[in-house]
From Swiss-Prot:
An annotated Gene Ontology molecular function: structural constituent of ribosome
Keywords: Ribonucleoprotein, Ribosomal protein
Pfam families reported for this sequence: Ribosomal_L29
Organism: Chlamydia trachomatis serovar L2 (strain ATCC VR-902B / DSM 19102 / 434/Bu)
Name of protein: Large ribosomal subunit protein uL29
InterPro entries (alphabetical): Ribosomal_protein_uL29, Ribosomal_uL29, Ribosomal_uL29_CS, Ribosomal_uL29_sf
Gene Ontology process terms (BP): translation
Taxonomic superkingdom: Bacteria
Protein family membership: Belongs to the universal ribosomal protein uL29 family.
Gene this chain is encoded by: rpmC
GO cellular component: cytosolic large ribosomal subunit
PROSITE patterns registered for this protein in UniProt: RIBOSOMAL_L29
Length: 72
């Protein structure tokens, strides 16, 4: 639980551009992991799929919260 709270605190401190970069980097890493799993007969740590997806979702939620605060 501590790591998740630290990640949320770090994400809340980031600007919108930094959040976009974080989301982009995580999407690239998720794509690379999927490609590695599909194209190579290599063992992939499957729990990483959900970790990347959850990190992306958290960043998108925080980005939306910031947008609502500005326009709300």
């Amino acid at each position: 639980m501590g790591a998740k709270k630290n990640l949320l605190a770090e994400l809340r401190e980031k600007s919108s551009e930094e959040l976009d970069e974080f989301i982009r980097d995580n999407k690239k890493a998720l794509f690379a992991l999927r490609a590695e799993a599909a194209l190579q007969n290599k063992v992939v740590k499957t729990h990483q799929f959900s970790l990347y997806k959850k990190s992306i979702a958290r960043a998108l939620i925080i980005k939306q919260e910031k947008k609502d605060r500005v326009h709300g």
